[in-house]
Amino acid sequence: SNKKNYQKEIVDKHNALRRSVK
């Protein structure tokens, strides 16, 4: 029921991946 939290988690994962690549 927390779609915002879900999206935030996805963004966090994406950011972590980008940081890893960088």
Swiss-Prot record:
GO cellular component assignments: extracellular region
Region (Disordered): 1-22
Localization per Swiss-Prot or TrEMBL: Secreted
Highest taxon of source: Eukaryota
Tissue-by-tissue expression: Expressed by the venom gland.
Record key words, sorted: Disulfide bond, Secreted, Toxin
GO molecular-function term, one example from the UniProt record: toxin activity
Region forming the signal peptide: none
UniProt KW Secreted keyword: yes
Composition bias type Basic and acidic residues, residue spans: 1-15
PTM section of the record: Contains 8 disulfide bonds.
Family: Belongs to the CRISP family.
Record-given protein name: Cysteine-rich venom protein collettin-a
Originating organism: Pseudechis colletti
